Amino acid sequence: MPFLKNVLPTSAKRAGYLDSMIPSPLPEPIPLLQAASIDTVMAALVAVPKQLRQKPGLHVVMLRDRRRVLLLESGALRQAFPVAIGMPGWETPTGRFKVLEKIDNPVWVHPVSGDRVADQSSANPLGSHWIAFHRDCLGRDAHDGETWITIEGCTTTGFHGTPHRWTVGRAISHGCVRLYNEDVRSLYRQVNLGTPVTVLP
């Protein structure tokens, strides 16, 4: 298959701009998430390993298979959020990370045209806030639906809002974790640089 060498501008190599670089195919439809029931949230909390529930301080735990982010404080559940995760082939990375960067009103730079889209625009795929937690500088090959591309330089995965509310609860992103804008605002206010983030399969 042909490979297209894609050299991203420096601004596009930063946090999560890859997430919206390639159009997403529509996934199989699933019911839209409603407000989380207490049972759903408690089941998610029980799925968190005991050693994580016993950690002191603030900790963000993502349960990828349940498409939930839990904000724990010394093991107690502070908040739970439904999320969208990476699609097959672009899975959200698992492991132990920490908050690397926070941006209020992020500006998204289109990786090809260089056009800038500000937060106030409904076209901004990052929504209202950006919280980076994972950086990958190994590069990768990816398929955009028509051709192969080589991603060069560093890409960053993080939590961000979305103008497309219907995507929350689906495996549809290019690795980033999408939240409703009101939820990412709440998470943004509560975490700091260095806050631990654990992503479980």
Task: Please report, for each region that a protein language model flagged, where it lies by residue.
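N-terminal pre-domains immediately preceding structured catalytic cores
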Residues: 1-201
